Design a protein with these regions (language model features):
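Alpha-helical transmembrane segments of polytopic membrane transporters and translocases
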Residues: 2-3, 18-19, 32-49, 77-84, ...
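Interfacial transmembrane-helix starts/ends
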Residues: 67-84, 88-96, 115-119
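Membrane-interface junctions at transmembrane-helix termini in multi-pass inner-membrane proteins
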Residues: 123-154, 194-196
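Helix-loop junctions and terminal segments of transmembrane helices
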Residues: 41-79, 135-141
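Interhelical loop/hinge segments that connect adjacent transmembrane helices in multipass membrane
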Residues: 1-16, 54, 58, 63-73, ...
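Interfacial/gating helices of multi-pass transporter permease domains
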Residues: 22-42, 70, 74, 111-116, ...
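C-terminal transmembrane helix end/exit motif
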Residues: 138, 180-203
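Interfacial segments at transmembrane-helix termini and the short loops linking adjacent helices
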Residues: 93-126, 173
Length: 203
């Protein structure tokens, strides 16, 4: 139980780090810009994550029945599906989010909402966040909370430390870089872990 709570707390830190760091080390105008872009990327993330709804119970059943062949097949298909949907959705987001924000904030002159570099990094970070879904789902289905809690804690610490270091110099882009590094780390760590302990999946 406590290992699951630790993972949940680390997840909350990953979710709220950007706004807190921007509030402390940057300005409220940066928080305002971040919130507008976050509105779009969160919507796309919810769309991608909905594709994998209900898969944890199926994977858990296959693990419990020790149906290794079916587990590997289902996981491979889920992984391919999520990767494809995430890349397509966030590729479109990278291309269209700035024009959308320009229309959404038309008439606002006190803040420059056109932040193309930030849009690129935050979209890429959220793409990697979605790509880790199959790994996260199969880990939870297998009940490997204790074995994987260090991954969540390290990712949260990476996000905090890198964001603080880079936000002072790069502002909005800095927190997006911190988030991106944290999720890239999680993807690599989780992919390596499940390939060794849960599914037969080359990594």
């Amino acid at each position: 139980k406590w290992y699951g709570i630790a993972q949940h707390m680390a997840h909350i830190v990953l979710d709220s780090t950007d706004v807190v760091i921007l509030t402390i080390f940057s300005s409220l105008s940066s928080v305002s810009v971040y919130s507008v872009y976050n509105l779009v990327t969160n919507g796309m993330r919810s769309l991608v994550l909905s594709v994998g709804t209900g898969m944890q119970s199926l994977l858990g059943e296959l693990i419990a029945k020790k149906e290794k062949g079916k587990l590997d097949t289902v996981f491979a298909r889920l992984d391919w599906l999520i990767h494809t949907v995430a890349v397509v959705c966030f590729g479109c987001t990278m291309a269209l989010v700035v024009p959308f924000v320009q229309i959404y904030t038309s008439g606002v002159t006190d803040i420059n909402y056109v932040q193309s570099l930030f849009a690129f990094f935050i979209s890429l970070a959220q793409c990697f966040r979605c790509i880790r879904l199959p790994y996260n789902v199969v880990i939870l289905a297998a009940g490997h909370y204790k074995q994987t809690q260090s991954n969540y804690i390290v990712a949260a610490l990476l996000n905090i430390s890198i964001s603080i270091f880079t936000v002072i110099r790069f502002g909005l882009v800095g927190v997006a870089i911190g988030t991106l590094v944290a999720f890239v780390y999680q993807n690599i760590w989780m992919a390596h872990y499940i390939s060794k302990h849960i599914v037969c999946w080359p990594f």
